[in-house]
């Protein structure tokens, strides 16, 4: 039996009489006067400003605020204030029960359905990043488009990176449910265009559309999880969804190969359509949209457009694309001294600098509000996410290359051999999310990630041609356990440290930096590998033409050199890859510097939403 509103007020106000509770209830139910925007709810001068969203902790949890730079958040556990000394719940909170955050708490089988739908949507979105790796040969043969091969992957990844910040603005200003459904529609439309593509150009356009939608699907899934359950349950389910992202990275090539060999490469995209349809139906039925901020509702269309920071959007999109194209083409398709690379580098740098100036000038209307970035928990989470995810990307790409080149593994088998790391990430990610939900604090587990992860990464640098399964399985597990412990926690930290209205923007910043870091350090690793491979081959085989080995794919190096030189070539190849692992290990260790400035905040708390009046 649900307690009455009167009983809830009585329980909040401690050992007070029901008579006093009735008085407080009457005060709560009085309509606001036109001369004030504050709702008086106690005897003294106490009031709750309707424009703020402070967090009120449960007993034993951290008491904090999320205004300004975030430096006013108290460190460590704080006792609950007496009823007359702290924040008092609003009428909406007392009517809704505990944790009335965002769109409303979902529980039971409805919660399970929503979480399953979100997980499947993120899985499909992540799958699209790697599913084409084994299907590209068939696609290029069908369209006779070998020169377009790079764009099949880049068109998707570029748009995901570029649009992440824009969706942060949209989710903060409009109802999360409807923005999410719009992005899901875009992702599905892009998948349909790709599946039915009659030409290479149509496939590239479809990939770009899917990327625009995919950026919003991933970010929106994280935000919906934050809105439909109490804050202390969020870490577990964010970790679950992040783990699925890792699984999709490995399963993608396997699934793409199965579709290509037994059905058609077009099913790499058609598979998204029924899953997206089911996800949309569940979101429509079970997720209650968050009420829009009344100040935003009352603004004109033009004023709302200005709130989206259109100037910032115009600058950030080409800036990111220029920088990523420089990293993709530089030293590979074109020399670093080529005029195309120089022009892109100058344009990207100039646009990025101009974007920074615009963000400082725009203030709270900026795509990346300076006050949010100044919050030390937020910028610590950014540093942590960049280093940890960059390290994870390096090992995700180059461990399979080591297996293919050194152990003669096929693409499919190399993915299977990479499973110890992925399983370690997924399992430990879920365990750390569960532990944070139980303990309340995420900082200890964020320290665990770079410490354990860098040990595993360091061990992987010792791999050599004769290393057996015992070595590479154990080392991968250690790396996976460390990486998994912190994979989802930057989002948890940001969502805990910020006020409810800033969560979508903070989450977008973390998602953007993670995606950009993955692309950035993948290209950096590629540059390191190519330069070290040429150097090591020339040092191991002086006087021998090693250009064919340097240009060969990992599975072709045995046929690219004479048998008598193969042992030295394999050793040089292995050393070149482990030298890339040094960069990954260093990145993983540097993630600890992102944890140091973070405040010890507890997830065992709830936000008090402002009372909205029509």
UniProtKB/Swiss-Prot annotation:
Family membership: Belongs to the major facilitator superfamily. TCR/Tet family.
Any one Pfam family match given in the protein's UniProt record, by short name: MFS_1
Functional note: MFS-type transporter; part of the gene cluster that mediates the biosynthesis of calidodehydroaustin, a fungal meroterpenoid.
Note: In A.calidoustus, the austinoid gene cluster lies on a contiguous DNA region, while clusters from E.nidulans and P.brasilianum are split in their respective genomes. Genetic rearrangements provoked variability among the clusters and E.nidulans produces the least number of austionoid derivatives with the end products austinol and dehydroaustinol, while P.brasilianum can produce until acetoxydehydroaustin, and A.calidoustus produces the highest number of identified derivatives.
Glycosylation sites noted in the Swiss-Prot or TrEMBL record: 15, 375
Record region (Disordered): 1-99
Origin organism lineage: Eukaryota, Fungi, Dikarya, Ascomycota, Pezizomycotina
Residue ranges crossing the lipid bilayer per the database entry: 105-125, 151-173, 185-205, 209-229, 236-256, 267-287, 311-331, 341-361, 382-402, 416-436, 439-459, 472-492, 509-529, 577-597
Membrane topology listed for this record: Multi-pass membrane protein
Compositional bias (Polar residues): 30-39, 56-66
Organism, scientific name: Aspergillus calidoustus
A GO cellular-component term linked to this record: plasma membrane
UniProtKB keywords: Glycoprotein, Membrane, Transmembrane, Transmembrane helix, Transport
GO molecular function: transmembrane transporter activity
Localisation: Membrane
Matches recorded under Gene3D superfamilies: MFS general substrate transporter like domains, Multidrug resistance protein D
UniProt-recorded name of the protein: MFS-type transporter ausY
Residue ranges, compositional bias (Basic residues): 16-25
InterPro entries given in the database record: MFS, MFS_dom, MFS_trans_sf
Domain of life: Eukaryota
rRNA processing found in the keyword field: no
């Amino acid at each position: 039996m649900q307690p009455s509103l009167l009983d809830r007020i009585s329980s909040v106000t401690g050992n007070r009489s029901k008579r006093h509770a009735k008085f407080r209830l009457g005060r709560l139910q009085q309509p606001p006067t036109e001369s004030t925007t504050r709702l008086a709810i106690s005897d003294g001068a106490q009031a709750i400003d309707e424009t703020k969203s402070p967090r009120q902790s449960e007993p034993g949890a951290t008491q904090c605020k999320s205004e300004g730079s975030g430096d006013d958040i108290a460190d460590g556990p704080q006792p609950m204030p007496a009823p007359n000394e702290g924040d008092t719940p609003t009428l909406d909170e007392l009517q809704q029960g505990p944790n009335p955050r965002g769109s409303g708490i979902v529980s039971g089988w409805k919660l399970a359905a929503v979480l399953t739908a979100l997980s499947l949507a993120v899985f499909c979105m992540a799958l699209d990043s790697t599913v084409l790796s084994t299907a590209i040969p068939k696609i290029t043969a069908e369209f006779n488009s070998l020169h377009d091969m790079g764009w099949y992957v880049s068109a998707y990844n570029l748009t995901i990176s570029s649009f992440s910040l824009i969706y942060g603005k949209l989710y903060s200003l409009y109802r999360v449910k409807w923005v999410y459904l719009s992005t899901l529609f875009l992702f599905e439309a892009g998948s349909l265009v790709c599946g039915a593509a009659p030409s290479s150009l149509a496939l590239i356009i479809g990939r770009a559309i899917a990327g625009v939608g995919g950026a919003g699907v991933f970010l929106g899934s994280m935000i919906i999880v934050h809105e439909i359950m109490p804050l202390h349950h969020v870490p577990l389910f964010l970790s679950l969804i992040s783990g699925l992202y890792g699984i999709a990275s490995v399963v993608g090539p396997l699934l793409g190969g199965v579709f290509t060999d037994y059905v058609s490469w077009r099913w790499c995209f058609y598979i998204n359509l029924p899953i997206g349809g089911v996800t949309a139906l569940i979101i429509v039925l079970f997720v209650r949209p968050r009420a829009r901020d009344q100040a935003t509702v009352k603004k004109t269309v033009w004023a709302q457009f200005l709130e989206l920071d259109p100037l910032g959007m115009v600058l950030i999109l080409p800036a990111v694309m220029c920088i990523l194209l420089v990293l993709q083409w530089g030293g590979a398709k074109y020399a670093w001294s080529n005029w195309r690379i120089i022009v892109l580098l100058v344009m990207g740098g100039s646009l990025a600098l101009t974007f920074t100036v615009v963000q400082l000038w725009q203030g709270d209307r900026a795509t990346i509000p300076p006050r949010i970035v100044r919050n030390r928990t937020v910028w610590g989470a950014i540093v942590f996410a960049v280093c940890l995810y960059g390290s994870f990307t390096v090992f995700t790409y180059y461990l399979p290359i080591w297996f293919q080149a050194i152990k003669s593994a096929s693409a499919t088998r190399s993915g299977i051999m990479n499973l110890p790391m992925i399983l370690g990430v997924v399992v430990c990610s879920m365990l750390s999310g569960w532990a944070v939900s139980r303990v309340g604090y995420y900082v200890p587990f964020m320290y665990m990630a770079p410490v354990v992860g860098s040990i595993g990464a360091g061990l992987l640098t010792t791999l050599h041609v004769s290393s057996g399964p015992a070595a590479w399985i154990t080392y991968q597990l250690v790396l996976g356990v460390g990486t998994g412990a912190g994979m989802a926690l930057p989002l948890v930290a940001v969502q805990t440290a910020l006020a409810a209205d800033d969560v979508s923007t903070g989450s977008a910043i973390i998602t953007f930096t993670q995606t950009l870091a993955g692309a950035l350090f993948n290209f950096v690793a590629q540059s390191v590998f190519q330069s070290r491979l040429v150097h090591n081959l020339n040092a191991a085989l002086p006087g021998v033409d090693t250009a064919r080995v340097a240009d060969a794919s990992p599975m072709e190096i045995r046929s690219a050199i004479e048998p008598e030189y193969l042992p030295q070539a394999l050793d040089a190849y292995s050393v070149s890859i482990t030298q890339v692992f040094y960069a990954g290990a260093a990145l993983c260790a540097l993630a600890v510097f992102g944890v140091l400035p973070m405040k010890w905040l507890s997830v065992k708390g709830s936000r008090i939403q402002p009372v909205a009046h029509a």
